C-alpha cells in the first residue's frame, strides 16, 4: 500500500491538471506551506485498494416518525451533498504542517490562527461520512488524524490543543471539549469504515481519547460536560458548561464502544440541565444559552433500556428519584461576548446536536426538547427561513442588529425540524434556503456546520 506521505506529494503534483471548481477564491496566503496543495486530495483517482464499509450515500434508517425533505428526490439531495462537499473540501482542507498532515483551515479570523480543534473535529467527521463518494477519504482522514496527534494538549496526548497558529504551534495546551468529542466520534466512524485496512488503530485511539474526555472534560460530580480540560474543583468554572458541548449521540457511541455506564448518567444529567433551563428561563421558546453556570444536579438511581435494536444497553433512561437541579445562564462577558447568557453563536448548534440524537436513538428527552423549540421557531419566523435571526434572548426575542443570514443558526433548525411531520413544509423551505447559498457566501464556521447538517438532512448520518 502506498504511504500516506508519498500519496500526498503525488496528489499535490497532480492537483493543477486534475481538479478545478467554479467556486474557488483567491488562495490562502499562509506563512510556509504551498497552499496549492489544499485541493490535492479532492476528486482524484483512488490511491487505496480498500473500500469503506459504509460508503456514501447510506440512506440510514432514522427513528420512525421522523422526516426528511420530501419535495425533491433522494438523488437530488445526495447530489447537493456531493457538490457542496467538493467545494468545502477544496477550500478548507489544507496540507500541512508536517508532510503527512492536513488541517481544516480556520477561515475568517483576523489573528494568526490557522486551525482550531472544533474545525478539525468537523472535518474528520465529514470526511469519514463522505467515504465512498470521495475515493481519497481515508488518505485525507489519516492526514487530519496526524495533525491532531501532532498538537496534543499538555494534560494528555489523546486530547487536542484547541488552536494552532501559522507557525504550526499550539497557542497553549488547553482543550475545547467539542473538538475532542467530534474527533473521538470520528475515530469510531473511521474504525467502522476502514478498521481492517489501516495502519492506524482507530478504535484503540478512540478508546484512549474517550477515556481522556471522561476524566478531564466531564465533571465527575455532576456528569456535566465541561468547557475544556482546564477546570479543576478549585476553578470558578468547575460547575459551568458550554451548551453546544452536549452531544448525546456521541456520548451514546462512547458508551457502546467503551462499555462504561458513566456515559449513561452523563446523557441523563445533561438532558436534565437542558430541560431545567427550558422550563425556568425559556418556557415559550425552548432555548438554552451559550454558557450555563452554577450547575448543581443530583444523580438519581436510574435503569436503562436499549433505544433501538442493536444499540446496546443504556441508551434511554428511566428515572424514579426526585430531581434536584439548579443552573443559571452566564452573565455578559463571562467568556466570549455580551451575549454569553443568550442563544448565540455557540448555542445555535444545540438543535442539531439534540435532533441528531433523536434521529438515531429516539430518546423521549430529545423529543421533549425539540417539541418546545420547533413550534416557536416556525411561529416567530412566520414560516419564512429568511426571518431567522442570528441570535435570540431566552424569551425568543431577536438580539439587536442581528438581522442577517447565518447558516450556523439556520441549518440546525432544519435538523431540528426532522423530529416531527408537523414540520414538513417548514423543513422543505429550510432545505431549499440552505442549498441555494454557495461556499463563497459564508466562512468556515457556517460552511462546516452546513456540510454536516446536509449529510444529516439527506439521510446519510449514522452511528458507529
Which residue stretches match the model-derived regions?
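Active-site-adjacent structural elements in enzyme catalytic domains
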Residues: 139-150, 185-189, 204-214
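Intrinsically disordered, low-structural-confidence terminal and linker regions
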Residues: 19-51
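Bacterial N-terminal signal peptides
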Residues: 5-16
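Extended ligand-binding clefts on enzyme/binding-domain cores
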Residues: 38-84, 113-117, 157-158, 172-178, ...
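Internal amphipathic alpha-helical repeat/solenoid segments
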Residues: 70-122, 127-172
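Short glycine/serine- and small hydrophobic-enriched flexible loop segments
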Residues: 124-132, 182-195, 249-253, 352-359, ...
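Solenoid-like repeat scaffolds
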Residues: 432-440
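Aromatic-rich carbohydrate-recognition surfaces in CAZymes
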Residues: 113-120, 170-194
Amino acid at each position: 500500500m502506498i504511504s500516506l506521505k508519498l500519496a500526498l506529494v503525488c496528489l499535490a503534483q497532480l492537483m493543477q491538471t486534475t481538479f478545478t471548481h467554479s467556486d474557488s477564491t483567491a488562495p490562502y496566503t499562509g506563512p510556509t506551506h504551498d497552499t496549492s496543495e489544499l485541493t490535492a486530495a479532492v476528486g482524484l483517482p483512488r490511491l487505496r485498494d480498500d473500500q469503506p464499509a459504509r460508503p456514501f450515500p447510506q440512506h440510514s434508517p432514522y427513528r420512525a416518525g421522523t422526516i426528511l425533505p420530501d419535495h425533491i428526490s433522494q438523488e437530488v439531495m445526495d447530489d447537493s451533498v456531493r457538490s457542496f462537499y467538493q467545494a468545502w473540501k477544496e477550500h478548507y482542507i489544507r496540507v500541512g504542517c508536517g508532510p503527512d498532515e492536513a488541517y481544516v483551515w480556520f477561515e475568517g479570523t483576523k489573528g494568526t490562527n490557522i486551525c482550531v480543534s472544533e474545525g478539525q473535529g468537523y472535518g474528520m467527521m465529514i470526511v469519514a461520512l463522505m467515504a465512498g463518494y470521495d475515493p481519497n477519504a481515508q488518505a485525507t482522514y489519516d492526514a487530519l488524524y496526524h495533525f491532531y496527534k501532532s498538537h496534543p494538549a499538555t494534560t494528555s496526548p489523546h486530547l487536542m490543543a484547541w488552536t494552532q497558529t501559522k507557525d504550526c504551534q499550539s497557542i497553549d495546551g488547553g482543550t475545547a471539549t467539542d473538538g475532542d468529542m467530534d474527533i473521538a466520534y470520528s475515530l469510531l466512524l473511521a474504525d467502522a469504515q476502514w478498521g481492517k485496512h489501516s495502519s492506524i488503530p482507530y478504535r484503540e485511539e478512540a478508546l484512549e481519547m474517550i477515556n481522556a474526555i471522561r476524566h478531564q472534560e466531564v465533571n465527575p460530580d455532576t456528569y456535566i460536560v465541561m468547557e475544556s480540560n482546564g477546570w479543576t474543583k478549585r476553578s470558578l468554572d468547575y460547575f459551568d458548561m458550554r451548551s453546544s458541548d452536549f452531544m448525546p449521540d456521541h456520548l451514546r457511541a462512547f458508551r457502546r464502544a467503551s462499555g462504561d455506564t458513566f456515559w449513561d448518567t452523563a446523557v441523563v444529567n445533561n438532558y436534565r440541565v437542558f430541560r431545567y433551563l427550558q422550563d425556568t428561563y425559556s418556557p415559550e421558546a425552548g432555548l438554552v444559552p451559550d454558557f450555563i453556570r452554577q450547575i448543581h444536579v443530583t444523580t438519581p438511581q436510574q435503569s436503562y433500556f436499549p433505544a433501538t435494536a442493536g444499540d446496546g444497553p443504556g441508551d434511554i433512561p428511566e428515572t424514579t428519584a426526585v430531581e434536584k437541579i439548579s443552573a443559571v445562564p452566564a452573565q455578559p462577558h463571562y467568556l466570549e461576548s455580551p451575549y454569553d447568557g443568550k442563544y448565540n453563536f455557540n448555542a445555535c448548534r444545540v438543535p442539531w446536536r439534540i435532533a441528531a440524537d433523536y434521529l438515531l436513538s429516539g430518546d423521549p428527552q430529545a423529543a421533549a426538547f425539540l417539541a418546545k423549540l420547533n413550534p416557536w421557531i416556525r411561529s416567530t419566523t412566520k414560516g419564512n427561513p429568511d426571518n431567522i435571526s442570528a441570535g435570540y434572548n431566552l424569551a425568543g426575542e431577536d438580539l439587536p442588529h442581528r438581522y442577517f443570514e447565518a447558516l450556523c443558526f439556520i441549518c440546525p433548525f432544519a435538523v431540528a425540524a426532522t423530529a416531527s411531520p408537523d414540520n414538513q413544509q417548514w423543513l422543505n423551505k429550510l432545505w431549499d434556503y440552505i442549498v441555494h447559498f454557495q461556499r463563497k457566501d459564508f466562512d468556515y464556521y457556517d460552511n462546516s456546520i452546513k456540510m454536516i447538517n446536509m449529510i444529516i438532512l439527506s439521510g446519510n448520518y449514522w452511528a458507529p
